[in-house]
A protein has these predicted regions:
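A conserved FAD-binding loop/helix module that cradles the flavin
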Residues: 1-66, 150-170
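Flexible, glycine-rich terminal cap/loop adjacent to redox cofactors
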Residues: 11, 56-62, 72-170
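Active-site-adjacent helical/loop segments in soluble small-molecule enzymes
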Residues: 69
Length: 170
């Protein structure tokens, strides 16, 4: 229990992994506490989601990097994509967001994602964490229903464009 124990990595097909993060410690503590009190709940595994901010640069990641996926034996493929956050006609600060989605070339299952920008796009990594947890394929993400409003995002944004690029083989 906590960050001194192993957890099950959804990015590695449920294999035990040591991923020492506070969020993993909290969730395993909740599961242990409920089960100790007679309320049976099951942990759902982890993706190892994390983030860091260095000066103005925000970087977030979940699941496996390309190198980690290859080391784990996957046919690791990546889709790299860069796009400004908002519609280009919006005349406000509009930083670029860089995204890399890692997926298995055989099963097409999403294995990981990394994003970086001076814009705070950090909440977007949660969607990729859920995709890994639920075993979604890169193809399913390509046509994901996301809202659009020019002052917030693009009509076909970097999440979906990274996935769509993978579908097209770009």
């Amino acid at each position: 229990m906590g960050d001194c124990s192993s957890c099950y990595s959804n990015a590695k097909d449920g294999e035990p992994a040591y991923i020492a993060l506070a969020t993993n410690a909290v969730r395993s503590g909740i599961v242990a506490g409920h089960n100790a009190c007679g309320m049976a709940i099951e942990g759902v595994g982890v993706q190892g989601s994390s983030g860091i901010c260095i000066y103005d640069l925000k970087m977030v990641a979940t699941g496996l990097t390309e190198a980690a996926a290859r080391k784990a034996g996957y046919d690791a493929c990546v889709s790299d994509f860069s796009q400004v956050q908002k519609a280009t006609f919006v005349e406000t600060e509009n930083p670029e967001v860089k995204i890399c989605v890692v997926f298995d070339g055989t099963t097409r299952r999403v294995l990981g994602a990394q994003m970086a920008s001076t814009y705070d796009m950090s909440a977007g990594i949660h969607m990729f964490s859920l995709a890994i947890q639920e075993g979604l394929t890169i193809d399913r993400l390509a046509l994901l229903d996301v809202f659009f409003l020019p002052h917030f995002n693009q009509p076909y944004n970097y999440y979906t464009m990274a996935a769509y690029s993978a579908v097209l083989g770009a």
